[in-house]
Amino acid sequence: MASVTSEKCVILSDGTEYDVTNYLVANKDAADLLRRYHRQEVADILNATSKSKHSEAVVEILKSAKVPLKNKEFSDLVDQNIGVGYGNEFIVKPTDLDKDFEKNHFLDLKKPLLPQILFGNIKKDVYLDQVHRPRHYRGSGSAPLFGNFLEPLTKTPWYMIPLIWVPCVTYGFLYACTGIPFSVAITFFIIGLFTWTLVEYTMHRFLFHLDEYTPDHPIFLTMHFAFHGCHHFLPADKYRLVMPPALFLIFATPWYHFIQLVLPHYIGVAGFSGAILGYVFYDLTHYFLHHRRMPNAYLTDLKTWHLDHHYKDYKSAYGITSWFWDRVFGTEGPLFNEQGKISTKAK
């Protein structure tokens, strides 16, 4: 097992990474101080008018690092100081709201966003270019969408998804078992679970990313932003990441009626229940890919894969819970090299 002092230690300052591992190994007395700032942005501390003993020590340590690490390519957005690191190590940097609006003249993040799109006379080409250039709202709050009593309806904490839908899945499966044998019910439940992965891919690629096929009209651009554009514009907003239950109900109802048309009632209920569980996995996976460190290599690659979709190429990597259907339909994205293997350069 590696000693505490031999483990890699990186400190961030103004979007630049400093590898101070060698200093830590040579100066074991500084280990506690350095570990305190590992993978943290310290620019505000270092630039403070009244520096503490600790901040002065960190300044000297960064100077001793001599050459900062070059950030791994993370699209041209890294150059815009939007974040540092990659994959599990990616850390967002808050957007300077005033400078962003002054530079791009797109949306003022301090004002309600939907009215700006609806009444702002924004052309589609400008909208599509800007909405796929992520911004990060300061603090733990959310940028306003409506700016009125409707605002709370646009926010959904992640835990509401299992809290609402897992009981529905359980009830649906048990209900199906009253009309068909358990073995049949569980078979179609599993089929529904895996069918969701195709629905997930199809919905993300052909519905949420209509993009160029969206009519060049403020109403349609506003709808695009409300459905998915907002998430690409503000990907780190933890309250506008999972799908609001009311919106999911609107999406799910036509699918339920379609399944009831093509399958016997109880079989349809079993399959639909499995698909709903697939959706729960999808939404939770999506949330944690954005907001948690992944515990193993596969999930770390999956996180990298999804961040590529946001920060490198939004026209690829549509799968969230897996890349299976992207491999089938040739939309793998930057994580895979030309031989179809995970590219070490992408990491």
UniProtKB/Swiss-Prot annotation:
In this entry, which stretches build a coiled coil? none
Query: Any ranges marked Cytoplasmic in the topology annotation, and which?
Result: 1-156, 200-238, 282-347
**Would you say which domain of life the source belongs to?**
Eukaryota
Topological domain (Lumenal) residues are 178, 260
What is the E.C. number?
1.14.18.-
Q: What does the record give as cofactor?
A: Zn(2+)
Q: Which GO terms describe its biological process?
A: fatty acid biosynthetic process; fatty acid metabolic process; mannosyl-inositol phosphorylceramide biosynthetic process; mannosyl-inositol phosphorylceramide metabolic process
The transmembrane segments are 157-177, 179-199, 239-259, 261-281
Q: Would you name any one GO CC term? A: endoplasmic reticulum membrane
Annotated metabolic or biological route of this protein: Sphingolipid metabolism
What are the GO MF terms of this UniProt record? fatty acid 2-hydroxylase activity; iron ion binding
* Keyword line: Electron transport, Endoplasmic reticulum, Fatty acid biosynthesis, Fatty acid metabolism, Heme, Iron, Lipid biosynthesis, Lipid metabolism, Membrane, Metal-binding, Oxidoreductase, Transmembrane, Transmembrane helix, Transport, Zinc
Q: Which residues bind Zn(2+) 2?
A: H231, H286, H290, H306, H310
Q: Where in the cell is it found?
A: Endoplasmic reticulum membrane
Q: Which residues bind Zn(2+) 1?
A: H204, H209, H228, H232, H309
The answer, when asked if Oxidoreductase is one of the entry's keywords, is yes
Tell me the membrane topology, using the record's own terms. Answer: Multi-pass membrane protein
Q: How is the cofactor bound?
A: Binds 2 Zn(2+) ions per subunit that likely form a catalytic dimetal center.
Q: Which Pfam families match?
A: FA_hydroxylase
State its role: Ceramide hydroxylase involved in the hydroxylation of sphingolipid-associated very long chain fatty acids.
**Family, similarity comment:** Belongs to the sterol desaturase family. SCS7 subfamily.
Q: What is this protein called?
A: Ceramide very long chain fatty acid hydroxylase scs7
The organism encoding this protein is: Schizosaccharomyces pombe (strain 972 / ATCC 24843) (Fission yeast)
What taxonomic classification does the UniProt entry list for its organism? Answer: Eukaryota, Fungi, Dikarya, Ascomycota, Taphrinomycotina
